């Protein structure tokens, strides 16, 4: 990136703005500036006041799991024809798999900051949307709006990521877009996707995106109040033609309406759908055993799953095979059927995240994925040394409790204290 900048300017970098805490928006900082430059004040790094909390909270608590799930989402473990001519839905495929660098911000932004950097007047807005600490940058003198990921580029917004995240509030997202619409930008610059030129075009893209988000939210809530469950909601809530056909910005390349609907339900109500049968269900393996027996036994269900593949019904084939795998996780005939079903679903999917999850899971089922190696590799991506060193000692120690094997310590009653001589 710096090499490309140097083709058009040799001016020094005096400031960096972290748009939000996601790794694709802050990893690699040491390729641009050094920690010594920041410490000396030669370079300023701006970020929202909650960025460090969000970054540490994610890395310290769920870093290992989120690293693996990110690998599935972005297709880091796929090779050859599986990724040939593919992108990430919001831009080129990330290189992935290597620990990034990080420098803690030196300047914090709350709701709004007006600042002049190197003679350029900037206004920085807090615009919670795809991330709770999202910042957008407005250059009033040139009418340029860097909206970061409030607008994710040419795709329906990823209102919930399959990687896993806390609730992304669609109401706040809409409010953030409306705030940016009020600036009447002539140039709209997302951090994913192509820039939008012209005030009318910028307004149209922002308006249609916020309308898409609000429509999905409002209709989901409307039908929730009628008593519909998530499985029922995804069959009912769909974008109307004037939004669904707004290509490419509301095409479901990266986010999908279905996963947005499910996260809205869980965000408002949690996991319980109102049927007490779900309060203490029969364990999955036992339920599978009973259902397979009712359906005629293992061989019969395997035959039905295989026939479903032949009949171009890969989803049903995968669901049938799943019952057999829950009974015996090493049932390779069932695993191969489910893997083939996932390949068919993956290659047919327009959404890149769904595609990558299907194809990567097919490798897992077939035994061609080195889960332990890849988990370790991706954990280092989500928890690189630069971030680990920024985790406060108290937070780090607190996170250790989630690693405790409680079954091995039920008879232990002791206290453990740590004293850090090198901390204030």
Where are these regions (language model features)?
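Metallo-beta-lactamase
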Residues: 1, 53-226
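Active-site metal-binding motif and surrounding structural segment of the metallo-beta-lactamase
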Residues: 2-45, 108
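Divalent metal-coordination and catalytic microenvironments
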Residues: 5, 20, 45, 109, ...
